[in-house]
From Swiss-Prot:
PANTHER family: OS05G0170800 PROTEIN (PTHR47191:SF2). This is Protein ApaG. InterPro entries: ApaG-like (IPR050718), ApaG_domain (IPR007474), ApaG_sf (IPR036767), Uncharacterised_ApaG (IPR023065). The gene is apaG. It comes from Anaeromyxobacter dehalogenans (strain 2CP-C). Coiled coil: none annotated. Residues 3-125 form the ApaG domain. It holds the Pfam family DUF525. PROSITE patterns: APAG.
Amino acid sequence: MSTAVTEGIEVTVRSTFRPERSEPGRFLFSYSVRVVNQGEAPAQLVSRHWIIVDANGEREEVVGDGVVGQQPHLEPGEHFEYTSFCVLKTPHGSMRGTYRMVRDDGQAFDATIAPFPLVVPGSLN
């Protein structure tokens, strides 16, 4: 699990290995994200930038609009949750990134998504 707070936007992520959707050389992980507006001003999540690194150091970047087809607008105290997936070629790696947030007054900033592990249980023993 990882948590980061940037300008009042808290991002918490938990990852889970999905053995039923994995096979040798293709390890599928789900990750659940909770974004909370702890600040005093509304903000909208408009885009994402993920950096995914596997155990071989192979890096993939994913950039796109919103998350799961949405661009949630969060009033102070509101939250948004979603679950998505990631596939690695190795049994462990990590993800990190940012969400581009825009305040109602047009001010934009990047909310940090702290690094979190993607690990097949027992693979690091």
